[in-house]
A protein has these predicted regions:
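PLP-dependent class I/II
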Residues: 1-191
């Protein structure tokens, strides 16, 4: 990706909000760590909200190493009024990053166990559904394409039928782009 961004002179925005939630045996590589040239034409966003379960604080931040790009990003944020979070959000974020290591140490094995349960259940009980291999985070993808081919349903109709007839509300993958069609997102953070 970095080579293509350089070749076509494209700025990369790397959404790294799930970067702290990585399962053992896997590694997250921040885009900005790929080298100076990659960092010159990129910026990354992240937040404590996913890792520490504090989305209500509405806090996120951008890391923009290159000065001229940083100024453009700051100007864009200023135009939409997104310049500073409130004091509670700042203090909550600082507390999460300063004192949240124990939380994260317990969260990751919990999520890994939930993922393994879902993958096992899907494999043994849901013929035609495949759990997509997962390296971290609390959102798992379930591949329903085989069922869609057999049923003749399109992704939107299938998602609607899951909600209305199956009483299961998953996030339909097609809303995340055409490659997501036929997949559904499942939040595995809850018991």
């Amino acid at each position: 990706m970095a080579e293509l961004a350089e070749k076509y002179d494209v700025i990369v925005l790397s959404d790294e909000i799930h970067g702290d939630i990585i399962f053992p045996g896997h590694r997250f590589v921040p885009y900005l760590s790929l080298g100076e040239e990659s960092a010159r034409r990129a910026w990354a966003t992240t937040a404590p909200s996913k890792t520490f379960n504090i989305p209500g604080l509405h806090t996120a931040y951008a890391i923009v190493p290159h000065f001229s790009l940083r100024e453009r990003v700051k100007d864009s944020f200023a135009r939409i009024g997104a310049t500073m979070p409130n004091l509670l959000s700042l203090e909550g974020s600082i507390a999460a990053y300063t004192h949240g290591e124990g939380w994260l140490d317990e969260l990751i094995p919990y999520l890994k166990a939930n993922y393994e349960f879902v993958a096992s259940y899907v494999s043994s009980e849901l013929q035609g559904v495949r759990s997509v291999e997962q390296e971290g985070t609390y959102i798992t993808w379930l591949d329903f394409r085989q069922i869609l081919r057999r049923s003749g349903f399109g992704p939107k109709r299938f998602a609607s039928a899951m909600r209305t007839e199956g009483k299961v509300w998953l996030s339909p993958g097609h809303v995340y782009g055409k490659d997501g069609a036929g997949n559904m997102r499942l939040n595995i953070a809850a018991p």
